[in-house]
């Protein structure tokens, strides 16, 4: 059997997010069908008027913040790619979401109550939060960011380093009068010292370190530019939760699952730190919050997908959910374990179809032609994936995107690789 062989054929630009075409053959960004070079100018005409299917509220949001909308669309495309990765071994593998352009919420499956619907909605909501919050921290959006805060933090860092240096000299018995002359690192590596440090009373500026701090390396404080997760959550909520009546079961489960997706991002924010000091030392650190890697977000939501709760709606039209006894696995999903809080779990209210055959009404492309693993007993095995129809063994040569990197805004730079391999294909 011939081993897979990859040959890089060259770089191609794969347009995502605010792009209309998946092919990109010119230098610059093809933003919504407009050929522009360099950083795009995202205006309401360039973004909003080319998006079909927007609600009135979404159109108002887009006109007010076209740059944030473009970032949200990029997050949606990232989420679709992650959805395809996480459900690659399932009969429904998110591929149909790509067929609905920039707004997959028009997809039939996202307007149903399946387990797959819940997972997809939560991942799309998480993608919007992640993309918008990250763009904010990079200063790419007019409505948020912290460039001014960065400059203020730089001044604070220089002052803090100076204080720590002077305290070091004080503890070492070095004359403060000669410290400024003998330590060029203070000015050469960290910019000019604040003017008031050259006064005749530098001791007045020193703030003694706490007694429990015995080493300068233990000193850290908040700084840098944290991802504006609150702004991302707010825009995701305003953008995605605005469809349908809140009393409709479809809308209520959608809003619930959107919230679960956003919560996974906020719950997994992590602290990132940077060292500051002379000559490569780490005299103290500034730290800020960053969003989790989106692969982690996808993996955590997949776990929730596998344990999603089957619910029914009370007939009181008051928005309350009840978990049903018995799920799609044929047994009570809560039996033998502590009852879970439904607020952090994905919920669904319709039993999923088998997705074996093409069925546009539920966005099923079927599994004919899908590659399966004949040695796997799982969902990706030929027995399950091919729905009992059997499989063929074929030698396949294909091209695929590889080594992709997302760039602001709004494209993905990929290499195109050629793959030749023997595969098992569902009949």
From Swiss-Prot:
Q: What does this protein do?
A: Member of the Wnt ligand gene family that encodes for secreted proteins, which activate the Wnt signaling cascade. Involved in neurogenesis. Performs a partially redundant function with wnt1 in the formation of the midbrain-hindbrain boundary (MHB) organizer.
- Cellular component per GO? extracellular space
Tissue expression remark:
In the embryo, expressed in the developing central nervous system (CNS), with an expression pattern very similar to that of wnt1.
**Lineage of the organism:** Eukaryota, Metazoa, Chordata, Craniata, Vertebrata
Q: What is this protein called?
A: Protein Wnt-10b
Q: Which InterPro entries does this one have?
A: Wnt, Wnt_C, Wnt_CS
What is the gene name? wnt10b
- Processing and modification events after translation: Palmitoleoylation is required for efficient binding to frizzled receptors. Depalmitoleoylation leads to Wnt signaling pathway inhibition.
Cited SMART domains: WNT1 (SM00097)
Query: Any idea where this protein resides?
Result: Secreted, Extracellular space, Extracellular matrix; Secreted
